[in-house]
Amino acid sequence: MINIYFNNNLCKQFHRGIKGYDVVADLFPELKNKAIAVKVNGESYDLSREITENCTFEVITTNSEEGLEIIRHDTAHIMAQAVKEIFPDTQITIGPTIKDGFYYDFATEHNFSSNDLEIIEKKMIEIINKNESFIREVWTREEAIKFFSSIGEDYKVKIISKIPNNENITVYKQGNFIDLCRGPHAPSTKTSKSFKLTKVSGSYWQGNSSNEKLQRIYGTAWRNEEELKSYLNNLIEIEKRDHRKIGKELELFHIQNEACGQVFWHKKGWTIYRTIENYIRKKLETNGYIEVKTPMLLNKELWEKSGHWDKFRENMFLSEAEDKVLAIKPMNCPCHIQIFNSKIRSYRDLPIRMAEFGICHRYEASGALHGLMRVRGFTQDDAHIFCTESQVISEALKFCNLLMEVYKDFGFTNILVKFSDRPENRAGSDETWDRAESALKKSVEAANLNYVLNPGDGAFYGPKLEFVLKDAIGREWQCGTLQMDFVLPERLGAYYVGSDGKKHHPIMLHRAILGTFERFIGILIEHHSGKFPIWLAPTQLSILTISEESIEYANSLKTKAEEHNIRVELDATNEKINYKIRNHIHKKIPVFWIVGKKEVNENSVSIRYLESNTQQVMPIDKALKTLLTCVSI
C-alpha cells in the first residue's frame, strides 16, 4: 500500500501501481471529467501513469493554465503526425508550447504554404476524431536511437544523444505515430478540437544561424471554440494595429535592407520622436536631472574594465583604427561613470541624476528584427543616479512617481511592476542584498504600487524593478526599469568623499522610462491604432475649405494656428468636402476645422473630431482656445 496526500495533508491509502485517473475518481469525483493530468510529488503525470510510492497528489484540470499548456502540447504532436502523414519525407525536430500556442520545426525540401496549412488542419481533425490514445513508454537509449535512426529521424537521434545517461528516454504514441517526449499528455486526442494553424516561418536547428535551415509552423489551441474565436479575433485586431502597416500608411518611417535594423524616420514620424524627446527633456529638467552626451565609439579597454566585453562582445559592432579595437556602445552606463569620475565628488554633491538620449547599437540576428520593436540602432531615454545608500529609497520613490506620471500622459494606466530579487550567481554580500532589496521594496510601497515577485531574476550586480505596460488590447510590454548597481561604480573606480573624509563608492541606479524611443513609438502606434493623443499627433489640425472663396480665410487661420505652435495642414484643393474629410480621417488627424462662406462671414469654424460624425460651429477665438487646451501637456 502507498499513502497519497491531498488537500493540505489529508491522506488515503491505495494499492501500489494505482493510476492517476483512479485516484481522481476516488478523491475528486467532481473533477473526473475535467482532469487532464495530475501532479505526483510536484511532477506532472499522465492520468494513465502508475503511482508507485508515497506522494502528494494534485489534479490538473483543463481550466488551469497547466491544463491549457497540455492541450497545446497535445496539438503540437497531432500537427507533427499530420505533417508526417502528408509529407512522409519530412523530419520532425522540436515542438514546444509557447505563449498562446505552440510550434513545430520541420526539416523538409517542401516549402510550406498557407494552402498546406489548410490541408494539415484537415488531417489533424481526422486524427482528433479518431480519439487516439496518447500512450507513454519508457525506452532504453539503445532502443530509442535504433528506432529513430531506422525511420530517418536524425534530429531525434541528436536530441537523444544530449540526454544525460541517467535519465529515462520516454516516447509517446498516438496511433502509428511515435515522438520523443517527456510528457505529460491528455488521455487522448479528443481534447485538442479547438485549434488553428496560424503561420509558417523559417528557423534554424537549435536557433543557430550556422546550422541547418528548418521550417516552423505555428499554431494556437484553446479549451473550446469560444476561446479560440476570441483569440483569432484578437489576432485580426493585432494585424490592424501593426505599427509597420500604420507607419507606412501615415508616412512615419521605413526600414530597408541597406540599413538592416535601423530606422529611416520620415517627417511625421520624426515629429513624434522630437515631441517625445522634448516632453521627456522637460520632465528631466523639472526633476533635477542633468543632460549629457557621450561618445558612440569607445576603446575596448573600457568595456573590458566594465565587464561588458565578456558578456556583450558578440552583440557589439566593432571597428579597428590605429591598431586599436573600438566598439560602438551597446549601452551608456560606463560612459556616465567617466563623467562622474572627471572630478572629485563630495557626499554633498549627491545625488547626481545624469541623463542622456543615448544612441546605442547592438547586433541582433536579422531573423529576430521586427519593425521598431526590435532594431540594431536605437536611442535610450537612459539615466543613472549616483547616490549614497541612504538616498536610495527617496530616489527610487521619485523615479517611480515620475514614471507613472509619464505613462499616464501617454495613455497607459494599467501598469504591472515586477520585483526581481537576488540571483544565484551574484556579487556582494547577503547583507548588502538585504539592504538593497528592502530599499527598493519600500520605495515601491511608498509610491502605492503593487508588485509581483520575480524570484532570482535580478542582475548579478543588484535587484531591479521592471515596469510592464498593458496596452489597449491587453498585451503586455516591458518598458521601464530601475536597477540597483553596487558593482560597476567600484569596478570603474567611481568614488565620492564622505562626511568622514574617506572614499566611498556610490550606489548607481540605472533607470529608463520608455526603454528605447523606437520600440516605445511602435508600442504607441499599436496602442492608439495610429490615432495619437492631440498633443502627440504629427499633424494636430486640418483646415478644410468648402469653396474657393474661403481659401484666404483658411490661410489666415493656418497662420494663427502656427503662431501658437499648432501643427497644422491646410487642404484647399478643389475636391468635395466629404472627400477631404474622408482623406484626413484616413490620415488620422485628430481635429478638423471646416470653413466655407458661412464661417467666413461669421469669423467662425465648424469643428469635427476624428472619432465623431458631428460638427460644432464655434467662434475662431474660442475654437483656438479649446484646441490649445487639448494640445498642451
Curated annotation (Swiss-Prot):
InterPro entries: aa-tRNA-synt_IIb, aa-tRNA-synth_II, aa-tRNA-synth_II/BPL/LPL, Anticodon-bd, Anticodon-bd_dom_sf, Beta-grasp_dom_sf, TGS, TGS-like. The keyword Lipid metabolism does not apply. It is found in: Cytoplasm. It is an enzyme of class 6 (ligase). Residues 1-61 form the TGS domain. One of its GO terms (cellular component) is cytoplasm. Belongs to the class-II aminoacyl-tRNA synthetase family. This is Threonine--tRNA ligase. It comes from Ehrlichia canis (strain Jake).
